[in-house]
A protein has these predicted regions:
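Intrinsically disordered, low-complexity cytosolic terminal tails
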Residues: 265-290
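Hydrophobic, aromatic-enriched alpha-helical segments typical of multi-pass transmembrane helices
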Residues: 1-267
Length: 290
């Protein structure tokens, strides 16, 4: 039986990345793009860019929103895994709390960042469509400074989103590695060791993705291609595969964890009874001697 939360999260990651790939390929294959004109902030080229963005905004917006929901939906499987691996909070508490913090941080950051980016791009598209961006120095100057300013703001906002995406991959690396340690050090394993090793592969790809995102600032074209490939592999293959595999194991693992938790509780209760009995006997002996 498949855990629904794992399957849902995996499907959302696949869908968001397919939409992102379609959106990016359309953007890359448009005929009017000129990298030199882009870096020179050529006003004519900038206006063409904003016309394209206004026409294709819904596809990019849909991909971004679904991606944010996918990261947030990842919280539910991670909370279940942490509860199972910690045996209801009785094992390696610090390690498993760290996993929860990383998962919650990645999900929250993506959601907030996506909301801020969507709001700023919608406002920028409104500016490009209805505001005067041609004549700032004088009424008929046709200086087009407004277009240059708008494009610079857009690049800065995109940079914010780039760093948010990079930090998400760093968080996923931490989650996968900590879960590997948790499973590897468990005597009676509830989740499979092979699944944990698959998570290590996911973590290594996540680090490569993080590095490629950061190094885009050094060489945008080269590292954007690397980031595109690693992100596609992560979101379409590794993360969904990791989640589907987890989904098949999780129901049985939760049942075993409940048994272990009950055993631990019974053991603690029995120990308490023995301690209380010993204390009572000591008090009785003391009273007799007195």
């Amino acid at each position: 039986m498949m855990d629904i939360s794992c399957a849902t999260s995996a499907i959302l990651f696949i869908l968001s990345n397919i939409l992102s790939i379609v959106s990016l390929k359309k953007y890359q294959n448009r005929s009017n793009f000129d990298y030199e004109a882009f870096t020179e902030l050529d006003p004519t080229h900038i206006q063409e860019e904003w016309e394209y963005r206004n026409e294709h905004r819904n596809l990019e917006l849909s991909a971004g929103v679904i991606n944010a929901v996918a990261w947030f939906s990842l919280l539910i499987p991670m909370l279940q895994v942490v509860w199972v691996q910690s045996v209801s909070g009785t094992r390696q508490l610090a390690l498993h709390v760290t996993v929860v913090v990383l998962a919650f941080g990645a999900a929250t950051t993506e959601l907030i960042g996506r909301v801020l980016y969507t709001g700023s791009t919608n406002a920028a598209q409104w500016l490009a469509k209805d505001f005067n961006l041609d004549n700032w120095l004088s009424e008929d100057s046709n200086d087009e400074i407004g277009w240059r300013t708008l494009e610079m703001i857009h690049v800065v906002v995109r940079g914010m989103l780039l760093w948010i995406d990079a930090l998400e991959w760093l968080a996923l690396f931490g989650i996968s590695m900590l879960l590997f340690v948790s499973i590897q050090t468990q005597k009676d394993r509830l989740l499979g060791r092979r699944w944990a090793l698959f998570g290590v592969i996911l973590g290594l790809f996540s680090i490569v993705d993080f590095a490629a995102d950061v190094l885009r600032l050094e060489s945008w074209r080269s590292f954007s291609e690397i980031a595109f490939v690693t992100t596609a592999i992560n979101r379409v293959i590794l993360i969904p595969g990791w989640l589907f595999w987890l989904g098949y194991q999780l129901p049985q693992a939760k049942a075993l964890a409940r048994k272990q938790s009950t055993t631990v509780a019974e053991g603690m209760q029995a120990s308490s009874v023995v301690v209380a009995k010993d204390a009572t006997e000591e008090q009785t002996e003391s009273a007799t001697l007195t």
